[in-house]
């Protein structure tokens, strides 16, 4: 059984709402240094900077350019699709134990960085801080829940008898 994050509810229960708001405000402030940064495409683990970019603006204040992202060419798009297919094939052969471990590691990392990630969600989607934190808490909870589900159901792989002995 997972223990839900419930960041805001915990802040209320421990009378630490001010600390919650200070952490969120601090995360917002630290992100301002990243505004307008140009990000690369990442295809097959390699960073590729494109000639053309587009701006991502905050919906709550469209004057703020949060980031610049590359416009992929047709060739880069095909490279990305092929890379994703290869990654899917690799992930498909990954044991359920390794998948569950990965889910938990991501959940732990998200939990450690929750105020920064929630601030990003708020800026990028225009959500208020409580909605953004709730979304992040839910993501962390789902990652942990599905890790538990994978393990309790042994990866959802059930070997059954075949009707025909030659059937695989």
Region roles according to the model:
Residues 49, 130, 159:
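Short, electropositive, low-hydrophobicity segments enriched in small/polar residues
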Residues 57, 61-154:
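Glycine-rich loop-to-alpha-helix module at the N-terminal edge of alpha/beta enzyme cores
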Residues 156-168:
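Conserved small-residue-rich beta-alpha loop and adjacent elements
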Residues 49-51, 64, 74-77, 165-167:
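Residues in flexible loops and secondary-structure boundaries
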Residues 1-61, 65-66:
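Hydrophobic face of amphipathic alpha-helices that form TPR/SEL1-like repeat modules
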